[in-house]
Regions:
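AMP-binding/adenylate-forming catalytic core of the ANL superfamily
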Residues: 1-64, 81
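Conserved C-terminal "lid"/linker of ANL adenylate-forming enzymes
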Residues: 60-89
Length: 89
């Protein structure tokens, strides 16, 4: 099991991340995660590089390959609760 607080701890190490969502889905009875990050507006690191760094940090923390993709600043809703950041599909 991967707990939301553990994922948040990894993501919050990156000051370039303004907001994020974790999408949880099931394929062939296996749970899968995808992390969607919204970079800070005006950030100095390209979004693709940020996604790669986060993916490596998640792999290091959980020994799993979790896909990470970036979206444009202002795309994700502001989330004040974990339940709005974790989406089950």
């Amino acid at each position: 099991n991967i707990y939301p607080t553990a994922v948040e701890k990894v993501l919050r190490r990156f000051s370039e991340v303004a907001e994020y969502q974790v999408i949880q889905s099931t394929r062939d009875s296996m749970a899968e995660l995808e992390v969607v990050v919204e970079p800070q507006s005006g950030g100095t690191i390209p979004a693709s590089e940020l996604s790669s760094r986060i993916a490596r940090a998640l792999h290091s923390a959980f020994a799993l390959r979790i896909p990470v993709r970036s979206v444009e600043p202002g795309t994700l809703p502001k989330a004040e609760f974990k339940s709005r950041r974790w989406i089950k599909q």
